[in-house]
Amino acid sequence: MHVIIATDGSKQSLQAARYLKSFADPDTITSIGVLAVTSPLAAVPFASEGDTGRKDIEELSFRAAAEAATAQIAEVLADWGPKVTQQVRSGSPATEIVKAAKAKEAGLIVVASQSGRASAVLMGSVAHRVLNHATCPVLVVRPGAKVKKPAKR
């Protein structure tokens, strides 16, 4: 089974990966795709900022942050067993997560229930949208979920 773990770089996303690792049997998971999605609107300055002339640098920094977020999750899962890949997409987070799951024929999507970021207020609940549109099971990990000792191989 392929598993998609969505991350926005938050502590909650990292906790969601640790939670999966704490109870899932790594022998039933063939691969894990760690996915971060950058919003195309994230590179657009606020109206009060005007044109900074640094759009290319801003886009690179958003992508670098997304790559760092996927690398952090991949590091947590590195010694666990299943093959881990990392991907950064651009678009609506919920849409891109669902698309990635369909493309990989994922058996499970893991997502944190909230990131605590201001962008979550503007975009609504990514976890809720994924839950309503995914064609596979979705594990929504709430803040404070207790992580037990990881399942052994």
Please describe what each predicted stretch is:
Residues 53-68:
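A short acidic, glycine-rich active-site loop
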Residues 1-19, 133-153:
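Intrinsically disordered or low-complexity boundary/linker segments at protein termini
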Residues 1-53:
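Small/aliphatic-rich secondary-structure junction motif
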Residues 75-109, 146-153:
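Structural beta-alpha unit
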Residues 16-17, 43-47, 98-99, 121-122, ...:
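Short, well-ordered secondary-structure micro-motifs
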Residues 108-129, 147:
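Glycine-rich, Arg-bearing micro-motifs that act as flexible, cationic patches
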Residues 36, 112-114, 142-143:
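Short secondary-structure boundary segments
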